[in-house]
């Protein structure tokens, strides 16, 4: 399973949004209706899923689904 698909599954599960809405360009706040608590919980779940720690300064830069996938891809290299 690609990282995008894993991230998408987590978002659909955590936020309860339709899978079709979860695109690389989708903003967590504007397009998916996430608040700051939702985003913090998503970051924790991504950390668990990918076995990594996302520093706060990096987490603050994650505004879209694509941002999350890019970060995950960057740590797996």
Curated annotation (Swiss-Prot):
GO terms for cellular component: cytosol; membrane. One of its GO terms (biological process) is lipid A biosynthetic process. The modification O-(pantetheine 4'-phosphoryl)serine is found at residue 36. This is Acyl carrier protein. It holds the Pfam family PP-binding. InterPro entries: ACP (IPR003231), ACP-like_sf (IPR036736), PP-bd_ACP (IPR009081), Ppantetheine_attach_site (IPR006162). Transmembrane segments: none annotated. It comes from Staphylococcus saprophyticus subsp. saprophyticus (strain ATCC 15305 / DSM 20229 / NCIMB 8711 / NCTC 7292 / S-41). Belongs to the acyl carrier protein (ACP) family. It is found in: Cytoplasm. 4'-phosphopantetheine is transferred from CoA to a specific serine of apo-ACP by AcpS. This modification is essential for activity because fatty acids are bound in thioester linkage to the sulfhydryl of the prosthetic group. The keyword Lipid biosynthesis applies. Residues 1-76 form the Carrier domain. NCBIfam families: acyl_carrier, PRK00982.1-2, PRK00982.1-4, PRK00982.1-5. Keywords: Cytoplasm, Fatty acid biosynthesis, Fatty acid metabolism, Lipid biosynthesis, Lipid metabolism, Phosphopantetheine, Phosphoprotein. Carrier of the growing fatty acid chain in fatty acid biosynthesis. One of its GO terms (molecular function) is acyl carrier activity. Pathway: Lipid metabolism; fatty acid biosynthesis.
